[in-house]
Amino acid sequence: MKKINYLLKQAGYFEGRRVDIVDILQMYKECGYHYNADQEAFMEKYAYLEIHYNHPIWKEDMLLRLNPIEAQKEITMDVVEEYNEFLQDDLLIIGDIEKENLTLFLSEKGFYYTGYDDCLKNWGDNFETMIKMLVSGEGGELQILDL
């Protein structure tokens, strides 16, 4: 986890970090997202970080952006609602992975997902473990929606 801590620190994270997320909460309200206290606390802690890492297979610089306002510009609520129905969970957009065109979500039940079209990947319930998996080239559990 040393590497993950280093990447987070490089992105501007520090212990006790709390940022103003009033604009994010307003976007959530306007788009119809629902969120709980844990999801809100996550955003206060990590919002607006840009985590750079080198993709182990493609050997390219990747960018995980924890900016849901920008990420929301790339996905419609119809798609989010389909994901919610499929998972029987409520997803909250928290960012994206730019070069992979993946939208990043935190579910009400505490799981991290990435989505693209009719594919979702479940990365588990630990944010730092998800980053570790991304950096090492591991994949989350693939789930294909039956649309």
Residue spans of the language-model regions?
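Compact, glycine/acidic-enriched structural inserts
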Residues: 120-145
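A surface-exposed partner-binding patch
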Residues: 1-102, 143-146
